[in-house]
Amino acid sequence: MLLLLLGILFLHIAVLVLLFVSTIVSQWLVGNGHTTDLWQNCTTSALGAVQHCYSSSVSEWLQSVQATMILSVIFSVLALFLFFCQLFTLTKGGRFYITGFFQILAGLCVMSAAAIYTVRHSEWHVNTDYSYGFAYILAWVAFPLALLSGIIYVILRKREL
């Protein structure tokens, strides 16, 4: 049981790291001397050093991506907190439904954000020299991992430690 708890805790922390990195790092779109994320657009030198950054546009779709990414981080942090609370207060044989629910919500939020960004980013950057950066890919990787950990939480029963 202890190994199972450590495994699910490791998976949850990995999802949290992926969500934080994908929300913060300026690598959602990468192009010729430019990097773009949810918050700003930056120009870079040939060596990769950031030269100038300016705020991203204020379009509604980008604000919805920003909001859903922030919600995914909040839901995942809340799920981790609830997991620790339930670990010490849940009766033997009880399931971690609330923790699983919030972790699944985090997964659905990050999926929504990445899907909206996928569909709408072409309006923002009509230049075809852009490709998806690693932060965008990390957001998509966080989606199935968050769903998986949420499902594991729902299935998991508390036993004796």
UniProtKB/Swiss-Prot annotation:
Coiled coil: none
Keywords: Cell cycle, Cell membrane, Disease variant, Glycoprotein, Growth arrest, Membrane, Transmembrane, Transmembrane helix, Ubl conjugation
A GO cellular component annotation in the UniProt record: compact myelin
GO MF, one annotated term: protein serine/threonine kinase inhibitor activity
Keyword Cell cycle: yes
Extracellular side: 32-64, 120-133
Segments in the Cytoplasmic topological domain: 1, 92-95, 157-160
Transmembrane spans: 2-31, 65-91, 96-119, 134-156
Posttranslational modification: Ubiquitinated by the DCX(DCAF13) E3 ubiquitin ligase complex, leading to its degradation.
UniProt note on tissues of expression: Schwann cells of the peripheral nervous system. Expressed at growth arrest of mammalian fibroblasts.
Family: Belongs to the PMP-22/EMP/MP20 family.
Disease connection: A defect in Pmp-22 is the cause of trembler (tr) phenotype. Trembler mice show a Schwann cells defect characterized by severe hypomyelination and continuing Schwann cells proliferation throughout life.
Name of the molecule in the record: Peripheral myelin protein 22
Gene: Pmp22
